[in-house]
UniProtKB/Swiss-Prot annotation:
Official protein name in the record: Iron-sulfur cluster insertion protein ErpA
Statement: the UniProt record of this protein carries the keyword Oxidoreductase: no
Cofactor binding comment, as recorded: Binds 1 iron-sulfur cluster per subunit.
Binding site for iron-sulfur cluster: 46, 110, 112
Keywords for this protein: Iron, Iron-sulfur, Metal-binding
Cellular component GO terms held in the UniProt record: cytosol
GO biological process: one example: iron-sulfur cluster assembly
GO molecular function: 2 iron, 2 sulfur cluster binding; 4 iron, 4 sulfur cluster binding; iron ion binding
Family, as annotated: Belongs to the HesB/IscA family.
Gene that encodes it: erpA
Amino acid sequence: MTSEVQVEVAMPIYFSDSAANKVKGLIAEEENPNMKLRVYVTGGGCSGFSYGFTFAETANEDDTKIENAGVTLLVDPMSLQYLVGGTVDYTNGLEGSRFFVNNPNATATCGCGSSFSM
């Protein structure tokens, strides 16, 4: 007799419904179901690190993949260490619309919110 053990693993980074729905809409506009949103961290910006977003058609072998609403968020291993516990989100307000990261690991952010320090 064999038994299965199911273990719930916490997601290393969260992909909000609003971000996933925006990506879903952009995929529909481009008519390219292979598109995935990639979030990454680079050195730079006024606080030391900057977030970046781009679209990719393929995932790298070592990417972390998070799915929501039928779309995929990709994070490379180097960036993931800075984003653990964070949330990729999307806002559309008076200041414009944009993807952003709510990062609990950031000790400081710049005024525009696109760079951070740890």
